[in-house]
Amino acid sequence: MLQLNEIRKTFNAGTVNAKVALDGVSLTLNDGDFVTVIGGNGAGKSTMLNIVAGTYPVDSGTIRLDEEDITALPEYKRARLIGRVFQDPMTGTAADMWIEENLAIAARRGKRHGLGWAITQKERVAYREMLKSLDLGLEERLSTKGGLLSGGQRQALTLLMATMNHPKLLLLDEHTAALDPKTAANVLALSDKFIEEGKLTALMVTHNMKDAIAHGNRLIMMNAGRIILDVSGEEKKALTVDALLETFAKASGTEFANDRALLA
């Protein structure tokens, strides 16, 4: 369970460039929740994920994960508990390392290891089985460097690396935005698969309203650092893009000015 309580964050506070990114955000995710997050540019979506991951400190408020207060926990320690996939496919994998080496690093995350770092044959067998689930033929390319993979292949590999240790929370920060529509659909399908099979709790930020409606069991909309809509269950299933646009306009007094929100 993830609990955010009255989270506030202002960048450049006390200056003429002050920007309120999160304005008293409170949010609870129950175990197994897959929540999609929608909102215009500057709404606070990615800032919220960065706050949860520990990239940014909060100005005030608390963050709890499985009843543990992690508000002051450094980002590198939270990485043992939280899996994350970024927008840029180049971010999540090491370009100069083999596929099996990337997987080995992910598998050892949060574990103590000495000088004996060699990958065992047993591990290679396990990695091949994991890679088969991607259906990209990567199980036969363990010694291929990450930099030789396509953007979609690298993002799929990153997704596997982020979920292979069954994190308490998975953060997906516009992880298909840099991909072509077909590849994005494949990565989203893999996301659904890993979240469902691993019974993971997940937060997925997206600009694409159709994707926000189609995936997850719950949807929240943000504007000006606040949550202005929170729907789940049958209410979410009945949502349409037009209804979301209307809700945004009523709550914010502005049009949702982002063409990517309407992409198929």
For each predicted feature, which ranges?
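A short, flexible loop at the N-terminus of ABC-type nucleotide-binding domains that lies
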Residues: 1, 10-24, 74
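ABC ATPase NBD coupling module
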Residues: 15, 69-83, 91, 113-116, ...
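The feature captures the beta-strand-to-loop junction immediately N-terminal to the Walker
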Residues: 38-40
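Helix-to-loop junction immediately C-terminal to a conserved catalytic motif
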Residues: 53
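Conserved ABC transporter NBD signature motif
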Residues: 61-69, 229-231
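A short, proline-enriched helix->beta-strand linker immediately N-terminal to the Walker B motif
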Residues: 164-168
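H-loop/switch region of ABC-family ATPase nucleotide-binding domains
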Residues: 206-207
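Conserved beta-strand-loop-alpha-helix hinge in the C-terminal portion
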Residues: 226-250
